[in-house]
Design a protein with these regions (language model features):
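Short, structured protein-protein interaction patches enriched in aromatics and acidic/basic residues
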Residues: 58-77
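Mature N-terminal segment immediately following signal peptide/propeptide cleavage
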Residues: 21-56
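Bacterial N-terminal signal peptides
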Residues: 3-14
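Flexible, active-site-adjacent loop/turn segments at secondary-structure boundaries
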Residues: 23, 40, 45-49, 61, ...
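Generic structural "secondary-structure junction" signal
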Residues: 27, 53, 65, 127, ...
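Boundary at the C-terminal end of the N-terminal hydrophobic targeting segment
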Residues: 11, 18-23
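Extended surface/linker regions that mediate inter-domain or inter-protein docking
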Residues: 75-226
Length: 226
């Protein structure tokens, strides 16, 4: 007679399910091969414009020398050598900061400034596209508030850090890669905007299924599998 202990041991060695390997990101260009119609609809969506680079058509902010004075900071928006810049004058002096990305599409477009140690920071003055209640132009996101450097709410602080606070929702396949010992970010992403796999998940397994010969599908004529 087989003991209950032996049966338990045998059952523990039998896999209850077959787990597939985790999927990898393939990028939307691979998705377009079969889903061009969906891609055309996506291309006009806010997801497609969640992050914009300078020079893109939908990045409509004007860098024509306009200024905003708020919270003890004077901000001037202008072009230098063909690139958008923000001249910041505050209690620490004056500095010029290049714009790395535009963040969002409407009713406002915020700007991201590249800072040391791999950080991207959201600047507290945004561009209103004029599609909401506010007229078109630059405006302070925190009017009347003066936040000193070192405060987490300052634009260089942790609460305005793109890597930690924003990236996972505005880009696809984000890995923050924060090194606490060195206090640096080595953030990477698969695609800069909210692309197909941000919502549907990594697509390599789906692609493998889609290109698999139909005779390999369950229920197919087994004679064709010889």
């Amino acid at each position: 007679m087989v003991s209950s202990i032996s049966i338990t041991l045998i059952l523990s060695l039998i896999p209850l399910s077959t787990e597939s390997a985790p999927s990898d990101y393939v990028g939307r260009q691979r998705c377009i091969e079969c889903h061009s119609g969906e891609h055309r609809l996506w291309a006009t969506s806010h997801h497609a414009s969640a992050m914009l680079q300078p020079g893109e058509k939908l990045a409509t902010a004007k860098f024509d020398g306009a200024t905003v004075n708020a919270g003890g900071v004077l901000s001037r928006f202008f072009f230098e050598n063909g690139s958008p810049q923000v001249e910041v004058t505050d209690r620490s002096g004056q500095k010029t900061l290049p714009v790395k990305y535009f963040f969002g599409i409407e009713p406002c477009q915020q700007i991201l400034i590249e800072q040391p140690n791999g950080r991207l920071q959201s600047y507290p003055v945004a561009w209103s596209t004029g599609t909401g209640e506010r007229k078109k132009g630059w405006y302070s996101l925190f009017p009347g508030e003066e936040t000193p450097p070192g405060d987490p709410l300052h634009w260089t602080g942790s609460l305005n850090n793109w890597n930690h606070m924003c990236a996972e929702c505005h880009s696809t396949g984000v890995v923050k890669n924060f090194n606490a010992q060195k206090n640096i970010f080595e953030t990477r992403y698969e695609e800069i905007d909210v692309s197909c796999e941000a919502c549907h998940g990594p697509g390599s397994s789906h692609v493998e299924w889609a290109v698999r010969p139909k005779e390999m599908e369950p229920g197919s004529n087994s004679e064709r599998l010889s």
